[in-house]
């Protein structure tokens, strides 16, 4: 299988900041709608170790620590995007809600291609 001829640049990192900061903004209200509550209930049904408090705490931590626009810009400003994207396999654990999110964020923002095997216990959230 051939990968697209995409070459990361500083514009790619800016785009990454925009996309993930927008996701952070959208997650600010997660857990308040009936749809969100159904997603949480489905995740708990899939993984009996998850609680709604754990899920909400994970989403809030991701939003505040990983998806804050200023923090993303500062973090990514320290790196140069790759000029030779690699395929990065991410095998996600399912013991903590959304535990594989940071791996995905790092892979995509560095300009690599993510190949993900989500945990069978965290498919609803990821």
What are these regions (language model features)?
Residues 74-126:
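Conserved small-residue-rich beta-alpha loop and adjacent elements
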Residues 1-89:
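N-terminal Rossmann-like NAD(P)+-binding subdomain of aldehyde/semialdehyde dehydrogenases
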């Amino acid at each position: 299988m051939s990968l697209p001829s995409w070459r990361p640049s500083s514009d790619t990192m800016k785009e990454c900041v925009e996309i993930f900061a927008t996701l952070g903004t959208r997650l600010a209200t997660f857990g308040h709608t009936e749809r969100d509550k159904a997603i949480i209930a489905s995740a708990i049904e899939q993984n009996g170790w998850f609680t709604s408090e754990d899920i909400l705490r994970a989403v809030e931590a991701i939003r505040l620590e990983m998806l804050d626009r200023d923090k993303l810009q500062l973090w990514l400003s320290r790196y140069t995007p790759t000029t030779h994207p690699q395929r990065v396999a991410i095998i996600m654990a399912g013991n903590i809600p959304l535990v594989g999110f940071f791996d995905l964020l790092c892979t995509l923002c560095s300009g690599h291609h993510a190949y993900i095997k989500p945990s069978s216990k965290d498919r609803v959230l990821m």
